[in-house]
Amino acid sequence: MSGAGPASPGRSGSALPLPLPLSLSLTGDRKREVPAAGTLLQPIIKDVGEIYSRLLDHRPVIQGEIRYFVKEFEEKRGLRELRVLENLKKTIFETNEDILPKCKQSMHDNLNEVLQRLQAANDTIHKLQEKEHEKRKIQADKLMAGEEKRIAQQETFLQEQQSKREEVDEEHRKAMERLKEQYSEMEKELAKYVSF
């Protein structure tokens, strides 16, 4: 085969017949046969290209499948997202119209009740604090009175001790004087007996 071969498929997906380069320098009869052989190969090459594109080149089929899948996916996704958005809109509308006013009313009612309870608890705590303050004041007064009484008793006790000590000292001094007198008398008597 002089330069002729199977056609290679292009990127476009269709097989184009290749031109047959005929650079043969043949004599006159042969020159007439070569173009006739080239024209005979053209339909074969074309058929081979079509067979290749039908059997081996799946790009058009795959592209069609991809387009169909994308179209179906976008339609289903669009409908699903539309349903989600409608459900969200419905939920928001119900929340704004029904639930939010109920929550506000319930919160207002409960807050009033809680506020009243807090006020009552605050009053009770204030009363308890006043009672506790009064108890502490009474207790402090009792402690001060007890302290003053103890100080007075201590002063009285110290004064009594001082007077008793003075009495004891006085008695001791008198007793010492008596003993001195007694000893001096005894010494005088002894002196009388010694002189004998």
From Swiss-Prot:
GO terms for biological process: anterograde synaptic vesicle transport; endosome to melanosome transport; melanosome transport; otolith morphogenesis; positive regulation of pigment cell differentiation; vesicle-mediated transport. GO terms for cellular component: axon cytoplasm; BLOC-1 complex; microvesicle; transport vesicle. It comes from the Eukaryota. Residues 103-196 form a coiled coil. It holds the Pfam family Muted. Transmembrane segments: none annotated. Keywords: Coiled coil. Belongs to the BLOC1S5 family. Component of the BLOC-1 complex, a complex that is required for normal biogenesis of lysosome-related organelles (LRO), such as platelet dense granules and melanosomes. Plays a role in intracellular vesicle trafficking. Component of the biogenesis of lysosome-related organelles complex 1 (BLOC-1). This is Biogenesis of lysosome-related organelles complex 1 subunit 5. It comes from Gallus gallus. The gene is BLOC1S5.
